């Protein structure tokens, strides 16, 4: 792609620049991400250059127009200009900071750069001519590169740390899995059911070792095909029996996940039909140890539980750990506190024994935030889905509600199931509001909707109640295939619970997952998005970011009306999907992004989609088709494709060769990527993405780079004179800093001495 001037690249954003100019004139401080960037002398004892292999996208198609956000890294992001002379300068003043908004490109690789949020401090520079080596020690937690202390004039100039350049060491993420003692478990036998596709019926059996051998000999369990066992567990049956809802769910899961063994677990005989108080206690004592003991040890265990079934999942995983010393891959709890609507005084009892330690990844899918608070520690991620309007409309006729759910998965697998009031029965003599039953069942169906490759839930990070210093509005994607947190964010390696909001639109033909509409605007204006399920905003420096879940029910991006006098700076919409391509077999979540063009009409803005669609990968661990697809790279960093951003341009930094730039930034900021543009060779190289240092042989002799992820700091040393640009990418902004490197007297002296 040909390079563009700054003016050309940002055409159409004159309003944005005007607003920013006014802010600058009035002396508004442009608060920056970095708490400190300083320049010091670099120790001249580097050794052993990093050797960078090819990028992660080995399977990317090179066919024009087939780009899905997985293409060659940074091929069209800030394309370098012509090769400058050493005396040339960039078109950036040396005493002023510039801000603008990134703009879309018109090629098939449309890229709108990206950045982050919340208050932060200005970049500060301090210059030093001290040539004494600084002390650099390898970190013990997350280490990318460590500096050796050999003669810098001989051999290579890099040394990879013993842990490798791309290893993420999780300081506190290892979970102490709890074991159950045999005497604590129920002596009653639970029952299980599986769908037999050949027979066209369900097979029900006791949860014993003999039963596992039976399903093996009858090929319900296939040793060759089945790599995962996926338990589905119902909740409290003291008032309502929803067995048929779950059997329909099991049939759908069996058809959509052919490489997984899907098993429905009924625990009525072990306490599910008792009182709510008893059921809460007995859910942790459900016993299937005999069945688990007969299973091959290499199987991966997953469990999805509704209401108290979430805690039964925890019991299953503890038994599995006690028997096999294995750890469940994931637990998905659907409205686990639902029973509290009948017995709110039992809240404390449910939190005595958390399920969060029972699997590698625990997610809670909830349609209400009631009973969820910062004291909750039951999940790695909470997915709070707004359902108030649409689910109530589905349940308007409480005894005739009906949903026909159809999903399309990998390999064009398609299946449909009908869920409705006819699938639910109530206990004799018990009268319950049918609409309440309907509202309890819909979250199960909402989770099953995400089996469809185009129906992943768009997520926006929210702060838990009473929490402070949370990074909100960070986007992500979630669906039933997810078995790991979002790798892109620093919270991947922390034990903090993450909270996300999402939304859903329900109808008698199934569910539709809404798109998210995002607007960048000055902080002084009032703005409301029409036809939104929910909306929120956050003030980010001198920009306000508005986000709203649109309640459109089609697969198409709608025209959006903004109630505001403006001005607005930028707008786009995005939704979640799973990548599905013959060219790139990894089934990873993606954020599909549509650029919008907005026109001011009277007291509103009308925003129309531009048909410029691109996608960026959301790196989460996924299980599908018999495989767990890891997200962390084996020998290189992962591609990062940014969305929209505020661009902050810093003055040119003048330094000498071998001077060290140390950049540190606030811990609550999320660095997504760092690129290094070499104007001398017209190349742009990615130095890191997320937690991983990239490997690129072309820059072996040009730059030294060291990244301390835990300490949120880095050292950068340029080894050859010339003109360069460093770009730090955050979820909502980009920091650009031109660097002019030249020989100085101290370096020339050292060079002469070394040569002698």
From Swiss-Prot:
Subcellular location: Secreted
InterPro entries reported in the protein's UniProt record: AB_hydrolase_fold (IPR029058)
UniProt-listed SUPFAM superfamilies: alpha/beta-Hydrolases
Any one cellular-component term (Gene Ontology): extracellular region
Major location (coarse): secreted
Superkingdom assignment: Viruses
UniProt keywords, alphabetically: Glycoprotein, Secreted, Signal
Record's function text: May play a role in host immune modulation since the protein is secreted and provides an advantage for growth in vivo while it is completely dispensable in cell culture.
Note: The recombinant protein experimentally lacks lipase activity. Additionally, it possesses an uncharged asparagine instead of an aspartic acid residue at the catalytic-triad acid position found in conventional cellular lipases.
Name of the protein: Virulence factor MDV010
Lineage, broadest ranks: Viruses, Duplodnaviria, Heunggongvirae, Peploviricota, Herviviricetes
Name of the coding gene: MDV010
């Amino acid at each position: 792609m040909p390079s563009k001037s700054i003016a050309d690249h940002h055409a159409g954003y004159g309003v944005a620049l005007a607003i920013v100019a006014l802010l600058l004139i009035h002396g508004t401080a442009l608060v920056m991400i970095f708490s400190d960037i300083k320049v010091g002398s670099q120790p001249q004892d580097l050794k052993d250059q990093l050797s960078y292999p090819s990028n992660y996208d080995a399977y990317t198609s090179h066919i024009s127009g087939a780009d899905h956000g997985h293409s060659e890294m940074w091929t069209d992001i800030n394309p370098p200009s012509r090769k400058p002379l050493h005396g040339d300068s960039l078109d950036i003043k040396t005493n002023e900071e510039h801000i603008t908004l990134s703009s879309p490109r018109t090629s098939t690789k449309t890229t709108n750069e990206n950045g982050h949020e919340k208050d932060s401090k200005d970049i500060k520079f301090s210059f030093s001519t001290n040539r004494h080596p600084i002390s650099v020690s390898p970190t013990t937690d997350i280490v990318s590169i460590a500096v050796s202390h050999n003669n810098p004039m001989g051999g290579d100039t890099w040394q990879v740390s013993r842990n490798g350049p791309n290893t993420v060491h999780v300081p506190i993420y290892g979970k102490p899995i709890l074991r159950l003692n045999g005497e604590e478990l129920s002596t009653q036998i639970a029952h299980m059911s599986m769908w037999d596709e050949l027979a066209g019926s369900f097979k029900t059996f006791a949860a014993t070792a003999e039963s596992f051998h039976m399903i093996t000999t009858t090929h319900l369990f296939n040793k060759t095909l089945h790599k995962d066992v996926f338990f589905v567990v119902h909740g409290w049956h003291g008032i309502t029996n929803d067995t048929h809802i779950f059997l329909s769910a099991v049939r759908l899961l069996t058809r959509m996940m052919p490489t997984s063994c899907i098993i429905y677990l009924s625990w009525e005989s072990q306490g599910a039909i008792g009182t709510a108080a008893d059921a809460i206690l007995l859910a942790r004592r459900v016993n299937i140890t005999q069945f688990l003991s007969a299973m091959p040890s290499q199987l991966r265990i997953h469990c999805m539980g509704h209401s108290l079934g979430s805690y039964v999942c925890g019991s299953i995983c503890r038994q599995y750990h006690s028997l096999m010393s294995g750890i469940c891959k994931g637990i998905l709890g659907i409205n686990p506190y639902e029973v509290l609507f009948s017995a709110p005084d039992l809240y404390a009892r449910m939190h005595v024994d958390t399920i969060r330690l029972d699997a590698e990844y625990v997610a809670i899918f909830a349609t209400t935030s009631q009973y969820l608070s910062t004291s909750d520690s039951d999940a790695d991620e909470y997915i709070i889905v707004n359902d108030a309007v649409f689910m109530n409309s589905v349940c308007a006729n409480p005894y005739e509600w009906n949903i026909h759910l159809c999903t399309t998965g990998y390999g064009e697998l398609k299946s449909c199931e009908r869920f409705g009031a006819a699938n639910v029965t109530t206990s004799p003599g018990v009268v319950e509001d049918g609409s309440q039953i309907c509202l309890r069942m819909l979250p199960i169906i909402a989770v099953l909707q995400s089996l469809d490759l185009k129906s992943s839930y768009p997520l926006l990070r929210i702060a838990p109640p009473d929490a402070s210093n949370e990074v909100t509005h960070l986007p992500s994607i979630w669906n039933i295939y997810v078995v790991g947190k979002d790798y892109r964010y620093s919270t991947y390696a922390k034990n903090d619970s993450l909270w996300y909001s999402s939304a859903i639109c329900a109808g008698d033909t199934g569910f539709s997952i809404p798109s998210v509409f995002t607007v960048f605007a000055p902080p002084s204006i009032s703005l409301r998005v029409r036809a939104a399920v929910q909306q929120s905003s956050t003030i980010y420096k001198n920009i306000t970011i508005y986000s709203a879940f649109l309640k459109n029910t089609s697969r198409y991006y709608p025209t959006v009306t903004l109630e505001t006098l403006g001005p607005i700076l930028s707008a786009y919409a995005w939704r979640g999907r799973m990548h599905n391509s013959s060219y790139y077999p990894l089934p990873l979540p993606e954020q599909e992004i549509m650029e919008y063009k907005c026109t001011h009409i009277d007291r509103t803005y009308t925003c129309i989609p531009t048909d410029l669609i691109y996608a960026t990968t959301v790196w989460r661990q996924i299980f599908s088709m018999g495989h767990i697809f890891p997200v962390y790279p084996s020998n290189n960093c992962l591609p990062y494709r940014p969305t929209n951003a505020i661009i902050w341009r810093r003055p040119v930094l003048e330094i000498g060769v071998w001077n060290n730039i140390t950049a540190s930034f606030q811990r609550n900021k999320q660095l997504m990527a760092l690129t290094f543009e070499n104007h001398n060779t017209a190349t742009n190289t990615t130095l890191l993405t997320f937690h991983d240092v990239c490997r690129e042989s072309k820059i072996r002799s040009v730059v030294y780079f060291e990244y301390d992820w835990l300490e949120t700091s880095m050292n950068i040393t340029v080894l050859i004179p010339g003109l360069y640009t460093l770009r730090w990418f955050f979820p909502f902004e980009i920091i650009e800093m031109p660097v002019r490197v030249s020989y100085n007297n101290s370096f020339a002296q050292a060079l002469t001495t070394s040569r002698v």
